[in-house]
């Protein structure tokens, strides 16, 4: 936690899901909350590769994401500050079918369901996962939901994250060893509501506010990218 404090608070650098959520979990526990560290599988519908999104969008990666469960008024809530622009921007109750507005106009929902990769002959007999989905434009006719990640209520230990972190930070197939990315949230004038984000991916910075998305900067060199971001 001390190293994370220096990186996140002092140097204002942020981090991956395991860094951000470990730091937040430590802060919440220091305030007296009951917090459980958990793990998730990111949906391949979130893949940066178009062919993967097209052909494997109904499947998930292995355990590669961290989130928290916090007990509030005897009810468990999911808390996650490590999924970038697609993550929830508020705690969500573990209630099957829960839906709410996230960063407008986007909506999020939570479902308790089996994922498509279960080996159960009857999908209803498969292990149920909590599934976090997003709907980008709910006003455009029937809602289309895109899976973001699935997770369980099983407590993950530091040694579990050691394995997860080793893979995500060293394996050549990992997103984090192939791409540079960073996200900053954009607040409204009162600094109360998140209205969008600035996201650097590879050499391009894009700004998203509401349903409007535009390229605001494109870097030509690594030095330019470091200075500009």
Predicted regions and their residues:
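Cysteine-centered nucleophilic/redox motifs
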Residues: 12-41, 68, 182
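Secondary-structure boundary elements
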Residues: 1-12
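Intrinsic-disorder/low-complexity, polar/charged segments
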Residues: 1, 157-159, 221
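Generic detector of short, locally flexible boundary/turn motifs and exposed helical patches
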Residues: 1-2, 32-38, 145-150
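His-Asp-centered catalytic microenvironments across diverse enzyme cores
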Residues: 43-207
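A conserved C-terminal secondary-structure "cap"
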Residues: 209-229
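Residues that form generic nucleotide/phosphate-binding pockets
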Residues: 7, 185, 228-229
């Amino acid at each position: 936690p001390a190293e994370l404090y220096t990186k996140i608070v002092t140097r204002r650098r942020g981090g991956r899901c395991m860094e951000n959520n470990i730091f937040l979990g430590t802060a919440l526990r220091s305030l007296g909350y009951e917090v459980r560290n958990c793990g998730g599988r990111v949906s391949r519908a979130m893949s940066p590769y178009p062919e993967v999104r097209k052909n494997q969008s109904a499947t998930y990666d292995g355990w590669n994401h961290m989130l928290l469960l916090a007990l509030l008024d005897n009810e468990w809530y999911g808390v996650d500050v490590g999924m970038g622009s697609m993550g929830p921007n508020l705690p969500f109750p573990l209630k099957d079918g829960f839906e709410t507005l996230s960063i407008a106009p986007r909506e999020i929902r939570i479902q308790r369901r089996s994922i498509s990769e279960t080996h159960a002959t009857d999908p209803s007999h498969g292990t149920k996962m909590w599934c976090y989905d997003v709907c980008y434009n709910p006003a455009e006719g029937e809602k289309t939901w895109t899976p973001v990640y699935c997770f369980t209520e099983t407590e993950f230990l530091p040694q579990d994250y050691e394995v997860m972190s080793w893979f995500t930070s060293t394996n050549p197939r990992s997103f984090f060893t192939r791409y540079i990315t960073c996200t900053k949230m954009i607040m409204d004038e009162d600094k109360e509501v998140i209205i969008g984000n600035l996201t650097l991916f590879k050499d391009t910075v894009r700004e998203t506010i509401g349903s409007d998305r535009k390229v605001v900067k494109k870097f030509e060199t690594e030095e330019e990218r470091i200075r500009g971001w």
